[in-house]
Amino acid sequence: MITRRNSLALGTALGAAGLATPALAQQRPLANLPSTMVWSVYDVGSAGYVEASAISDALGRAHGTRVRLQPSGTSIGRILPLRQRRASHAWLANELYFAAEGIYEYATPDWGPQDFRVLMGRRNAFSVVATRESGITKPEDLKGKRMAWVPANSSVNIKVMPVLAFAGLTLDDVELVQFPSYVASLRALIEGRADCAGAAVNTAVLRELEASPRGISWVQLDPGNERGWEAMRGVVSFAEPIAETVGSGVSANNPANVMGYRYPMITVNADTSEDEVYALMKAVDESFALYKDVNATMPRWAMSEAGTPPMDAAFHPGAIRYLREKDQWSADTQAWQDGMIRRNDALRAAWAEFMPGARGQAPEAFAAAWNERRTAVLGSIS
């Protein structure tokens, strides 16, 4: 269900896309597709919220499905409703990886590695952005430079580290300059208080950097550098090459070779009905024409793109069934899936063994002990 608040956020885009015509409003039932759903999503105004709104609107028009969007500005605020089954689906970014691995805010006795699965997810692009005057264009140029850093922004920080690893660098090789927020860290480049920062390529505030005298430059990650990409995937499993053409400082004629990741990813509990997941995959795929023109990134929800790995968690069996029918499930994809299942199973088993002796520890000691155990487990299955 698109509420009045949702409609205000979406009205212009959906109207411009021509989605309100009577011909497109004809509805037909789809077997096993729930008549009502609750989706936990990013805050109102975010890209994730707009995309969830557009797709839920399309499902309503095509099948009469009513979707209530439940926005939250925090990682826990999006994942907790899914875990507690107050939401049927969560539209997540890298907090899915954190929850599946039991790291950062999920390295606490109340959480640990979670058993979630994905349906599909849109490709997004990330790298380290720099001022053009800094001369930074590749990972090795980052050594000794002033990097804007937000200590509490785990989802950005975890993607900066693999960019450094591409050139064999770590956080010790850069000068970290702390800022209170993501936007503040990017404005620091405009103000000359930092040389570089981690950022999604389509971040709106970077248009200001692009237009400023300092100019904009992206750290390019050579897609042919196998050693560099292997080093990146040693830090995070979800990294993939992408030639980004949408965003600040890039275009179809001037793409940036950067790190691809998924945002948002449609996520469910592992034990969600296979038939329901299959039905939602089919509905999202077959209603693609109703939402693909809402903005420049919506075409990336095409199943041929959004139904491929890597993701931050393994695919749900219902999603796999649909992808097989679409002839989109290869031997390589199955090998990736098997590895992700093995990884999650090993981490959850290790957590079950770890917890009895770890309860009662101070939070920092608990997290440190679990991270040590997690590192050992992942080393044993690699």
Per-region residue spans from a language model:
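Extracytoplasmic/secreted proteins, especially bacterial periplasmic and envelope-associated proteins
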Residues: A47-A54, A58, G77, P81, ...
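An extracytoplasmic/periplasmic, membrane-proximal ligand-sensing/linker region
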Residues: P34, V201-R214, W218, D275-V277, ...
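Short, glycine-/small- and polar/acidic-enriched structural segments
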Residues: Q26-F166, V177, W218
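C-terminal segment of N-terminal export signals and the immediately downstream linker at the start
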Residues: M1, T21-S35, P223
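Ligand-binding clefts/hinges and TM-proximal coupling segments of bilobed small-molecule sensing domains
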Residues: R146-P162, F238-E305, M311
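Pocket-lining segment of extracytoplasmic ligand-binding domains
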Residues: N94-L96, Y104-Y106, S134, L171-D172, ...
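N-terminal export signals
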Residues: N6-A25
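Sec/Tat-exported extracytoplasmic proteins
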Residues: L59-H63, R86, R132, R146, ...
